[in-house]
A protein has these predicted regions:
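Residue-level signal for inorganic ion chemistry
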Residues: 19, 48, 86, 114, ...
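Conserved small/polar residues in nucleotide/adenosyl-binding loops
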Residues: 328-335
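Nucleotide phosphate-binding/pyrophosphate-handling subdomain across enzymes
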Residues: 14-18, 108-109, 187-269
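Walker A (P-loop) phosphate-binding motif
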Residues: 72, 76-112
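C-terminal helical cap/extension that packs against the catalytic core
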Residues: 255-310
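Flexible active-site lid/hinge loop adjacent to a nucleotide/diphosphate
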Residues: 126-186, 322-327
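Short, basic phosphate-binding NTP loop
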Residues: 1-85, 211, 282-285, 293-309
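Conserved substrate/cofactor phosphate-moiety recognition/catalytic segment
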Residues: 112-124
Length: 335
C-alpha cells in the first residue's frame, strides 16, 4: 500500500510522522518545494493525505483520483478523547487558549488544531479532552462531524478568496453546529461548565502573543489581525483602554481579500499605511488623517519625530499578501 502526503507544512509533516510510526510507504508532494514535485499519478496511490490549506478545487480533484484523508478524519477515527471543536472568524485561538487554561490545572486536555499543535501528534496520549481550533479550511474538508461539543463564536466576512462568497463561508462555519452538542458563545467559563457540568475557578488568563499584546508601555502588537473585523475590535479596545492617551494605528497587508471594502476607522490620531499594498489600502481607508509609507521602518521613523504621539497600535487588518513585515522593528521601537 502506497500513500501520498499532499502539502508539506505543519500538517504535512505531522502526516509524515504518523505514517512513519505505522511503517507505511509514502511520497510527498508540495508545489513550493522542488524536491517534492516528482510523484506518481494520483491514481497510483491508495491514500492521499491532504493538508487544510490545499485549494478546494485541488481537493475535489484528488477525491476523484484516490481515497483522501485529512488529519481531522484520522483524529476522529483513532482518538478516544472527548472532542471540543471551536471555530469563528475572530478570537478562536484566544478562546481555545483561555479554555485550555481552565482545564490545564487537571492535566487532562490537549490543545490542538489550527492553533499550531498538530492533531496527529496527540492521538490517544492519555488526555480526557481535546480542544480543537478549527479553521474554515478544515471544516470545508471535514467528511463527517464527530465532535462531541461544537462551539461557534462568531461569523464575519473572511477568506472569500477561498470560499467565493460570504454565504459559502457561513455555510462552512456552521458545519460545527452539526456536532453531537453545540453552543454559540465566546465565554470560556460558559464552555467549561457546559462541557464538564461544573464551574471553573476564576482565573487571570494568559494571552497569546501578537493578539492585542502589550510589548512595552506604549506599543500594542496585534499583528495577528488579518481582517477588518479583528482590526475594528482592536480599535474598540484601544479606544477604551487608552483613554486620554492618543495613539496611532499602523496597518498593512493586501486588501484584495477584503474585496477592497471602504472603511472609516474612528479613534486613532493618525492612520499610518505601509507595505507593498499601501496605495490600495489608502483607497479603502476613508480617514483624512492617514499617511502612507514604504515600509514599517519608515512609519516608525515618522512616529519618532511626532512628539504628541504617545502610543502605537500595530494591527494590520489585512492578510499579509506580498508584505514581509519584520516585527523586530516594532519591538525595538520605544516612544
Amino acid at each position: 500500500m502506497k500513500s501520498l502526503i499532499y502539502g508539506y507544512g505543519i500538517t504535512g509533516k505531522s502526516f509524515e510522522r504518523y505514517l512513519q510510526k505505522k511503517n507505511l510507504e509514502f511520497d510527498i508532494f508540495d508545489s513550493n518545494i522542488s524536491k517534492f514535485k516528482n510523484i506518481e499519478p494520483f491514481e497510483e496511490y491508495d491514500y492521499i493525505y491532504c493538508s487544510p490549506g490545499v485549494p478546494r478545487s485541488v481537493f475535489k480533484l484528488l477525491k476523484t483520483k484516490s481515497n483522501v484523508l485529512t488529519d481531522l478524519d484520522i483524529f476522529f477515527r483513532e482518538d478516544a478523547s472527548i472532542k471540543i471543536g471551536i471555530t469563528g472568524t475572530n478570537r478562536k485561538s484566544t478562546t481555545c487558549f483561555h479554555l485550555y487554561q481552565l482545564f490545564k490545572s487537571q492535566d487532562i486536555v490537549n490543545l490542538i488544531g489550527n492553533i499550531g499543535n498538530p492533531m496527529l501528534d496527540s492521538i490517544n496520549n492519555g488526555k480526557k479532552y481535546s480542544i480543537i481550533e478549527l479553521s474554515s479550511f478544515q471544516l470545508d474538508k471535514m467528511s463527517v462531524n464527530e465532535l462531541d461539543f461544537g462551539i461557534l463564536l462568531n461569523i464575519a466576512e473572511d477568506h472569500l478568496d477561498y470560499h467565493g462568497s460570504f454565504e459559502d463561508y457561513k455555510r462552512t462555519k456552521k458545519k460545527v453546529l452539526n456536532s453531537k452538542k453545540f453552543l454559540k458563545t465566546e465565554d470560556p467559563y460558559e464552555i467549561f461548565e457546559w462541557v464538564t457540568g461544573s464551574k471553573a475557578q476564576n482565573q487571570t488568563f494568559k494571552d497569546l502573543p501578537y493578539r492585542y499584546q502589550k510589548v512595552s508601555n506604549s506599543i500594542i502588537n496585534d499583528s495577528k489581525s488579518t481582517n477588518m473585523h479583528s482590526l475594528q475590535y482592536a480599535i474598540e479596545l484601544a479606544n477604551k483602554g487608552l483613554q486620554n492617551k492618543n495613539y496611532v494605528l499602523i496597518t498593512c497587508g493586501n486588501p484584495e481579500k477584503e474585496r477592497f471594502s471602504k472603511v472609516s476607522l474612528d479613534g486613532p490620531e493618525e492612520v499610518l499605511i505601509c507595505g507593498n499594498h499601501r496605495k490600495e489600502i489608502s483607497e479603502c481607508i476613508q480617514n483624512t488623517n492617514k499617511k502612507i509609507f514604504l515600509n514599517l521602518r519608515k512609519a516608525l521613523n515618522h512616529i519618532k519625530h511626532e512628539k504628541n504621539i504617545k502610543n502605537i497600535l500595530f494591527s494590520p487588518g489585512y492578510p499579509s499578501g506580498t508584505d514581509s513585515v519584520s516585527y523586530t522593528h516594532l519591538r525595538a521601537h520605544e516612544t
